[in-house]
């Protein structure tokens, strides 16, 4: 342990002295970048901004759906407690059950993402929960599952605003970042501001949406699978359908957020 602490302290000191991790291992990225052409530098900064925007969209989507899960548990708390009381188990069993449900919270959040995106999720082969409709079925005796959505209501369509809103957050951030160099390139080539803005915004939105969907691929796959035989062989979301839907909604929100933020900035100027 002392050797580990000394090593970490020495590494931190060397990193502080070098200024960057690249300098620490003898690489001068600034000098390498300066040898690139203007278009290569634009492409690099553009790609990096899209990656960060997609990560931001994933974080926003996850946070909003975590709030939805918490809100749903609060609203259906009576049903949750009823299932817990039916299970019994005493103090120790109740504690273990509570810890089990806490461990399932990331899974519930992933299911909520699938729910708000449209394709939905299943808790059993005969069930489907989505903002477009619901087919409830008997669920495993886990208290938190007492908060599963019941019958479908038209107002649930409003929850499509969740992935669209996550995309809008990414779009606003992209404008503030100011790395939409494709717009600059198209404008110099065609001279039409309307054409360059339309095409560059479309490209930015599509790339951000696609990358957001790809980033969700692994988490959604990890929260889908089987819990046994029979009806419980189908648990979780249809991963590819959800990723495609998220990509579309985020792209829509990204374009809307980017153009809205641009209009607001232009109005202020």
Say what each PLM segment does:
Residues 33-51, 89, 188-197:
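Cytosolic juxtamembrane amphipathic/interface segments immediately preceding
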Residues 1, 82-164, 220-269:
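Long, glycine/tryptophan/cysteine-rich extracytoplasmic
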């Amino acid at each position: 342990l002392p050797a580990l602490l000394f090593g970490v302290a020495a590494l931190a000191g060397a990193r502080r002295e070098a200024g960057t991790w690249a300098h620490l291992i003898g690489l001068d990225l600034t000098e390498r970048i300066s040898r690139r052409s203007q278009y290569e530098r634009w492409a690099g900064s553009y790609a990096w901004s899209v990656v960060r925007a997609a990560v931001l969209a994933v974080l926003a989507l996850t946070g909003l759906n975590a709030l939805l899960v918490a809100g749903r548990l609060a609203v259906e708390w009576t049903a949750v407690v009823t299932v817990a009381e039916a299970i019994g188990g005493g103090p120790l069993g109740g504690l273990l059950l509570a810890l089990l449900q806490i461990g399932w919270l990331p899974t519930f959040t992933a299911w909520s993402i699938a729910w708000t995106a449209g394709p939905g999720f299943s808790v059993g082969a005969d069930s489907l929960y989505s903002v477009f409709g619901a087919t409830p079925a008997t669920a495993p005796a886990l208290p938190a599952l007492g908060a599963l959505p019941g019958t479908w209501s038209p107002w649930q369509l409003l929850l499509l605003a969740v992935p669209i809103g996550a995309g809008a957050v990414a779009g606003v951030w992209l404008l503030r970042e100011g790395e939409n160099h494709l717009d600059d390139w198209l404008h110099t080539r065609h001279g039409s501001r309307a054409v360059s803005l339309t095409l560059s915004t479309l490209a930015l939105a599509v790339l951000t949406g696609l990358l957001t969907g790809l980033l969700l691929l692994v988490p959604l796959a990890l929260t889908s699978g089987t819990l046994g035989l029979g009806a419980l062989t189908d648990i979780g979301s249809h991963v590819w359908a959800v990723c495609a839907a998220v990509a579309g909604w985020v792209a829509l929100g990204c374009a809307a957020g980017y153009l809205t933020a641009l209009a607001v900035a232009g109005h202020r100027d």
